[in-house]
Design a protein with these regions (language model features):
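Hydrophobic h-region of N-terminal signal peptides that target proteins for export
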Residues: 2-10
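Ser/Thr-rich, low-complexity intrinsically disordered terminal regions
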Residues: 10-175
Length: 175
């Protein structure tokens, strides 16, 4: 029983629909599109060092395989730009009898210059329940915004859209 307690704590965290991290204001919009941006200051790091570090990370993280087509689609060391098309699964829940997940597609743009790395994630789309009659497709704008993914009081995540929002924010934080 004592061995299960840490696992129960982790499960509760994953399903905590009132965590402020996921509530109002967690989704940023740019020109009507869901966009996540993060700027990293790396004092003393040259553009070439940052570029090679980020290029190595992107090449390792985004590799196509027989099921997914994630890949680096553009690179220009002179500009300091790397563009990636991401494709992976977001797993909402997994048990021996069921698997609830969605495929997420997104664009990730990395721009580097001396001492700074800027990352932008946008053009986010989902393909949910793909094995059942072709599944359903959604864009982030119609599925994870405050209006769709939060309750009316904006104090907790909505039952269905909320899981997409939570997992998308967690993916953004991982990147």
């Amino acid at each position: 029983l004592m061995l299960c307690l840490p696992l129960m704590g982790m499960a509760k965290e994953k399903n905590d629909n009132t965590d402020p991290k996921y509530l109002a204001g967690a989704i940023t919009m740019t020109d009507g599109k869901v966009t996540f941006s993060k700027d990293f200051n790396v004092p003393g790091a040259s553009k070439s060092v940052l570029y090679s570090t980020m290029k190595k990370w992107a090449d390792g993280r985004f590799q196509p395989n027989e099921k997914m087509n994630a890949r680096v689609v553009y690179e220009n060391e002179t500009e300091g730009t790397i563009a990636v098309m991401g494709e992976e699964y977001l797993v909402f829940s997994s048990t021996a009898l069921s698997l609830d997940r969605t495929r997420i597609y997104y664009a990730l743009t990395i721009n580097v210059k001396d001492g700074q790395c800027d990352m932008t994630m946008n053009r986010i789309k989902y393909w949910y329940d793909e094995a059942r009659n072709g599944g359903e497709r959604y864009t982030a704008e119609e599925w994870i915004t405050d209006d769709m993914a939060l309750n009316k009081k904006r104090t907790k995540l909505a039952p269905i859209c909320g899981k997409f929002r939570r997992e998308t924010i967690d993916l953004k934080d991982q990147l």
